[in-house]
Amino acid sequence: MPIQNILLVDDSKTELHLLSDMLTQKGYTVRTAENGEEAMRRLAEAKPDLILMDVVMPGTNGFQLTRAITRDPRFAGVPVIICTSKNQETDRVWGMRQGARDYVVKPVVADELIAKIKALEGAKG
């Protein structure tokens, strides 16, 4: 199943801009949210094909939000890729335990991220 619509969740306007531009240039439709509350509103408006989730955010962090989304039946089948500067093995393992399907470390390398998205497309199909 192809991935077309992506929700980016990051409290950094710079990261949102960079990732949004990168993904838009590759043909994806991108919506953004700057925190957990806004992300949940965006999810209620339209279910994306993929969520790219930062970890360090005010309020609900990305690990907590990933757990909430992946356990919510309304969003069943929507994969989450953690996209963060946290590069410790314990962070990666914890992110996967919260329900993330993959983990990308910032600064994001475009080819790596696109390859991970394409791999998820194959897994969803």
Give the label of every model feature segment.
Residues 17-25:
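Charged docking surfaces used in two-component/phosphorelay signaling
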Residues 57:
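Receiver (REC) domain active-site loop signature in two-component systems and cognate sites
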Residues 101:
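Short, glycine/charged-rich "phosphate-handling" switch motifs in NTP-dependent
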Residues 27-34, 42:
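Short hydrophobic/Thr-rich beta-strand motif most characteristic of the beta2 strand and flanking loop
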Residues 46-52:
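Active-site beta3 strand of CheY-like receiver
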Residues 107-118:
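C-terminal output helix
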